[in-house]
Amino acid sequence: MYRDPEAASPGAPTRDVLLVSAIITVSLSVTIVLCGLCHWCQRKLGKRYKNSLETVGTPDSGRGRGEKKAIKLPAGGKAVNTAPVPGQTPHDESDRRTETRSSVSDLVNSLTSEMLMLSPGSEEDEAHEGCSRENLGRIQFSVGYNFQESTLTVKVMKAQELPAKDFSGTSDPFVKIYLLPDKKHKLETKVKRKNLNPHWNETFLFEGFPYEKVVQRVLYLQVLDYDRFSRNDPIGEVSIPLNKVDLTQMQTFWKDLKPCSDGSGSRGELLLSLCYNPSANSIIVNIIKARNLKAMDIGGTSDPYVKVWLMYKDKRVEKKKTVTKKRNLNPIFNESFAFDIPTEKLRETTIIITVMDKDKLSRNDVIGKIYLSWKSGPGEVKHWKDMIARPRQPVAQWHQLKA
C-alpha cells in the first residue's frame, strides 16, 4: 500500500530536520564566539583611541606672514607675538599633531608645592642650578611688566646644549609659552632647523593684563623638537611663579631645562653592551635585559621585544630584533647582533634601539627608544665614546628609555 510521507507520525523527525537543526546550532555558537572576540578587540582599541584623543592644540593662523598674532585670554588681555626677525622658515601648523594635555596639567598641580624664590641672572655669572641626572640644556629669556600699558613682556632669546632628539644627531627646537593655569592658549617661537644652540630673539606681549592678575600666574616655557610626521618630542621645561619675580624692570634668566612632566611615568630601562672591533670593522650590540618596563596591555603587563636599527647618514641600513618575552616587565634577552661598520663611516653612524610591545590583534606599541651615536644625549654619547676607547671589550651601560 502507498503511504504518503507527509502523513507519517508527527513524533518522528526526519533526517533533514535533524541536519538543519545541527547546522543552526553550530552557526549560533560560531556567531557568539566571534561577537565576544570583536567586543574584546573593540575595548582594547577603544582605550588606545581614547588616549590619542586626549590632546590639546591651538591652531595658529598667519604664522610666518609677519603680522602680529593675538590671543584673547581669560584675564581680559591679549598676547601678541612681535618677533622682529622676518624671513625665517616657520613650522607649518597643519603638519603638527597635537600634544598631550598632561604635561601642562601635571605642572599646574606640582607648582602649588614648589613656589620657590627665583633670582635673575646673566650668561656670565649664573651657574647651573643643581646637578640634574641628565643634561637637557638651558634657556635664556627675560620677563617684565609695563604698568602704564598693563602689558607683560616675555622675550625668548636662545638655548644652549640641547640634546639631540633626531636619529641624525640633531634637533629642530621651538618654544611654547603659557601663563598657567591657563592651559588652552599658548604662543610659540619659530622652529630652528637642525640646531642644538638656537637663537630666537622673539618677543611676546600680554597686553591689557592687570598686574594683580599677572602675579597670580606662572610663566611656563616648554622646549620641543619639531617633527613633521609624528608627535613633537618634548626636550625640557622651565616654570617661574610671577609673584616671585621683580617685574618692575626686565629681568633676564638663564635656567636649566628640567624633564617635562608628561604624566606617562617612567618607560623603563635597558641594559646593553657595545663591542667595537676596528680590525674587523664591526660593532656587536648585546641586548642584555630590561627593567621596570611600562605596562602597555590592559592586563597591566607587556610582551616586549627589541628592534635594533643601523643607520648611516639618516638612512636605514640593517635591522635586527630579539625574540618576544611574554607578559614580562623585567625581561632577560641576552641576544647579540653584529653590524659591519667601516671605521671611516663611524661618525655618521647611529644605532637606534627600540623596545616594542607585541600585540597580536593590533599594531605593536613603542615602549621607548635609545639613540646611540657621537651626537646623541650625554649618557648615550658617553657609552659610544667608551666603546671606541676600549676596542674589543664589551662595554655595558643602563639606558633610560625615552619617548
UniProtKB/Swiss-Prot annotation:
The chain crosses the membrane at residues 17-37. Ca(2+) 1 binds at D166, D172, D225, D227. One of its GO terms (cellular component) is phagocytic vesicle membrane. The modification Phosphothreonine is found at T58. Ca(2+) sensor involved in Ca(2+)-dependent exocytosis of secretory and synaptic vesicles through Ca(2+) and phospholipid binding to the C2 domain. Ca(2+) induces binding of the C2-domains to phospholipid membranes and to assembled SNARE-complexes; both actions contribute to triggering exocytosis. SYT7 binds Ca(2+) with high affinity and slow kinetics compared to other synaptotagmins. Involved in Ca(2+)-triggered lysosomal exocytosis, a major component of the plasma membrane repair. The C2 domains bind Ca(2+) and membranes. Binding to membranes involves Ca(2+)-dependent phospholipid binding. Compared to other members of the family, the C2 domains of SYT7 dock and insert into cellular membranes in response to intracellular Ca(2+) concentrations that are lower than those required for other synaptotagmins. The two C2 domains bind independently to planar membranes, without interdomain cooperativity. Moreover, SYT7 C2 domains insert more deeply into membranes compared to other synaptotagmins. This is Synaptotagmin-7. It comes from Mus musculus.
